[in-house]
């Protein structure tokens, strides 16, 4: 096996283990939820479809982990997470694959500030365990995870890094025009908020 490919496999395994180690230590419970579902919700994606012969029922492969995890929260499990495969029957490019591993977590009695704290600490924990430090080389840059993460709204981020102010964009047509100007691909179904999200990904 090519050494670089081997290193990627080893590093991925360490990352998954480190995520589990951190979340378990924070009181989260790892769960498994159904892959075959009657209603594939939780994301805007086209599902793969199949047929269950024993019940003569059409089923779908899940496109996200969200809905069953939220049911567990409502049922009284206050901190849950899942690392599992999801399937999306759509485009194929550098950011889209028909099947991929997704991690989702949910916890009760917190807000988005608590979730940001959790995310920031998770990244630091994984980086420290997997690489032995908090300074990560990325191309010509070094990402320093020891510093507090910038906390900024999506609108402010696009304005700061792409010089586009979505507060000044009044309607969908104007948003589409801005997207075309910046070579951001979008679909007919995308609304202004979707184009804002695509703009953030683009930068």
Model-derived features with residue positions:
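Class II aminoacyl-tRNA synthetase catalytic cores and aaRS-like
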Residues: 1-201
């Amino acid at each position: 096996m090519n050494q670089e490919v081997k290193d990627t496999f080893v590093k991925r395994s360490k990352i998954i283990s480190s995520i589990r180690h951190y979340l378990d230590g924070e009181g989260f419970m790892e769960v498994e939820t159904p892959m075959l579902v009657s209603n594939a919700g939780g994301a805007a994606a086209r599902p793969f479809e199949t047929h269950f012969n024993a019940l003569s029922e059409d089923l779908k492969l899940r496109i996200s982990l969200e809905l069953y995890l939220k049911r567990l929260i409502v049922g009284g499990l206050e901190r849950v997470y899942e690392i599992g495969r999801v399937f999306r029957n759509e485009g194929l490019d550098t950011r889209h694959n028909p099947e991929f591993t997704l991690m989702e977590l949910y916890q009760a009695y917190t807000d988005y500030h608590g979730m940001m704290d959790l995310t920031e600490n998770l990244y630091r924990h994984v980086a420290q365990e997997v690489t032995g430090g908090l300074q990560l080389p990325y191309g010509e840059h070094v990402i320093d995870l020891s510093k507090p993460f910038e906390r900024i709204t999506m609108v402010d981020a696009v304005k700061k890094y792409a010089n586009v102010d979505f507060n000044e964009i009044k309607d969908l047509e104007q948003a589409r025009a801005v997207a075309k100007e910046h070579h951001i691909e979008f679909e007919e179904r995308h609304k202004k908020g979707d184009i804002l999200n695509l703009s953030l990904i683009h930068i």
